[in-house]
Amino acid sequence: MNIELLQQLCEASAVSGDEQEVRDILINTLEPCVNEITFDGLGSFVARKGNKGPKVAVVGHMDEVGFMVTHIDESGFLRFTTIGGWWNQSMLNHRVTIRTHKGFKIPGVIGSVAPHALTEKQKQQPLSFDEMFIDIGANSREEAEKRGVEIGDFISPEANFACWGEDKVVGKALDNRIGCAMMAELLQTVNNPEITLYGVGSVEEEVGLRGAQTSAEHIKPDVMIVLDTAVAGDVPGIDNIKYPLKLGQGPGLMLFDKRYFPNQKLVAVLKNCAAHNDLPLQFSTMKTGATDGGRYNVMGGGRPVVALCLPTRYLHANSGMISKADYDALLTLIRDFLTTLTAEKVNAFSQFRQVD
């Protein structure tokens, strides 16, 4: 694990629709070791390594969940709307960063009423999104605007990046900066002259998998590996039958989500790779969400796709948690798969006539 790269990516502010900071990091990281960097019309990052053989894409979405400024009141408080999926109880009194249209960063906090000022009835009622506000310490609308805040500015969560103990990493936007970091590490280390390897940082995944569709049309890959996160069910309050993934027990192979089924031959090959390398592998399903695989698998008449996810605690909140061991196991698994891939193997993924 390149922990320095992951920290740099997690600390970037890159809400859906405003992914430039992550895009810049990927450009600076990968430009020295790839043949070409291009972008689709929405801004998805596409790096190409090699120029012969089947096109194999490794995809991690760049965007994170966040907010957008929708109103500045007379007292300088900001009203906002959510971008991506949020639970209102995970938001109050958390720090945020407003990224202005000119690229300046302004700190803020989602305000909350002190318990002393709440009635017993109010204490039992969750605050709705519409009642929340962000305090940037401004005394008036004029002061907020003078600092550069405008309607339409993007807002990202704010949290410290840290390593806890020997194995855990805690930070914001692990969904899905881990996919971006791993994609970059694979582009740096995999050298297979039999394939053309693409690294994709897709945009706007959290609001409808949009960059997956546009980047798929841009590349027209022959096989795709989607890297993402998935709910870890190893904490109190989560149904661990519906959400069986556990930190430290290996990466998860997504058997289906709301928009995708994996190519079963691709699944079999990855299972064999894991067994051959003595790597742990878990399995999960997701009925209420989707990964970029849901757009890639229906591109151009259909393509073989598989989504591999890191178990992650506290998704879509200020601070998530992953296991270094899970990350390293997934990196080893995909590196082995990509290094041994040939045109014959890629073609076999799409052969559906049974042979006696």
Where are the predicted features?
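N-terminal hydrophobic/helix-forming segments and targeting peptides
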Residues: 1-356
